[in-house]
């Protein structure tokens, strides 16, 4: 499944969450509310999730295999770096 669009909405507030992202696949299916998070080992993505009654977070949508997760994460983080660098130049 090819990623055909990545839309980044940067978060300006201080904190670990840096952006909220929408990813489109094959110009036919979109996943909203993927988060870019600054962790101890650098940036990573968190798939959209909801909080269960017992306080646990469960993914609403997520990749089934590691290769797909890595492909999605690379596309998102590459686009995030482009957007971040554009903002720094302005």
Swiss-Prot record:
InterPro entries: SpoVG (IPR007170), SpoVG_sf (IPR036751)
One BP term from GO: sporulation resulting in formation of a cellular spore
Domain of life: Bacteria
Keywords: Cell cycle, Cell division, Septation
Pfam families, sorted: SpoVG
Family membership noted in the UniProt record: Belongs to the SpoVG family.
Function, as annotated: Could be involved in septation.
Name of this chain's protein: Putative septation protein SpoVG
The organism of origin for this protein: Clostridium perfringens (strain SM101 / Type A)
Species classification: Bacteria, Bacillati, Bacillota, Clostridia, Eubacteriales
This protein's encoding gene: spoVG
């Amino acid at each position: 499944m090819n990623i055909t669009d990545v839309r980044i909405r940067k978060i300006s507030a201080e904190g670990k969450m840096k952006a909220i992202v929408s990813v489109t696949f094959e110009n036919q299916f979109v996943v909203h509310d993927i988060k870019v998070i600054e962790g101890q080992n650098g940036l990573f993505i968190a798939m959209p999730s909801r909080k269960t009654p017992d306080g646990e977070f469960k993914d609403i949508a997520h990749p089934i295999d590691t290769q797909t997760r890595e492909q999605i994460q690379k596309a998102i983080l590459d686009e995030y770096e482009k957007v971040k660098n554009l903002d720094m130049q302005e």
